[in-house]
């Protein structure tokens, strides 16, 4: 009798486990499209010069743009250091979409990367902008270049120039 109950319980648990474990079969289209695993991270973080805060990009739902926000590591206090209103293209009046930013060594300018295009596996082509935090001036680099053709832009060590690659040539702008 006990054996019959044990067999019945085992059979029910195996059958119900098989039903709950039924999943959609993997196919190549889902894998290539990136529909299999989706992760959500906190995005890129950059330590600021003071060594006590880091900056992150955050969407501003009111403006549709991107704020650059600083968080203090000790207490996680939050401060918007560059509002999306400063990251607006003056010619169109619309906020520029921000993919990533890098700071100059003195934290007085930021290099903004946007409008990215994939080359092989990585988004290495795009457009670059420089925001001068002293006067709030936002300037697009490579104005005469084709859209999304610039790569690997970096500040000079003194933060006065930016170098980038486009069409296998190296350019430097003040």
Task: Give the residues covered by each predicted segment.
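Bacterial N-terminal signal peptides that target proteins for export
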Residues: 1-8
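Glycine-centered signal
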Residues: 1, 19-20
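Beta-propeller folds
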Residues: 20-174
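Bacterial N-terminal signal peptides
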Residues: 8-17
